[in-house]
């Protein structure tokens, strides 16, 4: 099993207990098909992280939602709109998506790296075209696409002012 490759995902639930002193006596899991699922697609700024101190908004989001909403965080560090498709991550989401679900999308951090030609997504054309695919596929299934603006990197110019690290990408 390779967690970095959607082709290796299966329909099994894996539960990891991180403390050597933790104990689990029993667990009962039942499918809740009647609740909306909020799917998350994105990069390291959204993905679930194994250990702190860094956390992403994607892994904290469930704390702020009312009961009765499932969250499926499919984000992965290093992903772009292009590589998320190539790794079949969007296919994984779409295979589980139903009417009334949500698709939250936050990309840009890696898309904007022109030094990564295999994953670079040009802001004025390709980036928008990929977003249109994600949006159309979610809508085709009766889900609600939600575009989340990428947070700015902390980059300072010579005058000590923070600069826009995602210049040219939609906000």
Q: Where are these predicted regions, by residue range?
A:
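Gly/Ser/Thr-rich beta-alpha loop segments that engage phosphate groups in nucleotides
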Residues: 44, 80, 110
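Extracellular carbohydrate recognition and processing domains
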Residues: 1-3
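Alpha-helical cap/lid subdomain in secreted, periplasmic
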Residues: 60, 88-171
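Serine-esterase "nucleophile elbow" of acetyl-processing enzymes
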Residues: 5, 12-76, 91-103
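Acidic/histidine-rich helix-loop elements
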Residues: 48-53, 73-87, 114-122
